[in-house]
Amino acid sequence: MKHYELLFILKPTLTEEEVKAKVDFVKEVITKNGGEIATVVEMGTRKLAYTIKKYERGTYFVIYYKAPPTLLAELTRNIRITEDIIRFLSVKYENKREIAAWERLCKGIKQTIKKEPREPREPRAPREPKAEKIEEQTFSEE
């Protein structure tokens, strides 16, 4: 099986339930066609670099998965049919170096997700304003 990364952008107008349904749909297409999902990352809603289908923002997701090469055509077909996905990109990791990077990415993402949230810090005391230095100017008589 080959190693892949799928980045896709959903419309910003979708509700949380609709977003979850679309992500589950993509995951289902991958698993039904013989793929194994390593990890799913929600990158959040971000401003797009340029307007896509009249949207200036989008909700980003990245899915790292292993799958047979035949899955890519079926996945692409299903994503193109879905109107709520405004853009997608599939990346294939081929050589040993790229596969090792893929595994490090998946492992690193899983570790950051498992970390417990830190306790909030105590608020700091407000800083005193710095006094501006006023330099004396000397004028020479000419």
UniProtKB/Swiss-Prot annotation:
Amino acid composition bias (Basic and acidic residues), ranges on this chain: 113-136
Gene3D superfamilies (alphabetical): 3.30.70.60
Keyword Methyltransferase attributed: no
UniProt keywords, alphabetically: Ribonucleoprotein, Ribosomal protein, RNA-binding, rRNA-binding
Lineage top rank: taxon: Bacteria
GO biological process entries: translation
Region Disordered: start-end pairs: 113-142
One Pfam family this sequence matches: Ribosomal_S6
Keyword DNA-binding annotated: no
UniProt cross-references to InterPro entries, sorted A to Z: Ribosomal_bS6 (IPR000529), Ribosomal_bS6_sf (IPR035980), Ribosomal_S6_plastid/chlpt (IPR020814), Transl_elong_EF1B/ribsomal_bS6 (IPR014717)
Coiled-coil region(s): none
GO CC annotations on file: cytosolic small ribosomal subunit
GO molecular function, one term: structural constituent of ribosome
Similarity comment: Belongs to the bacterial ribosomal protein bS6 family.
Purpose: Binds together with bS18 to 16S ribosomal RNA.
Protein's name according to its UniProt entry: Small ribosomal subunit protein bS6
Species of origin: Campylobacter curvus (strain 525.92)
Recorded name of the encoding gene: rpsF
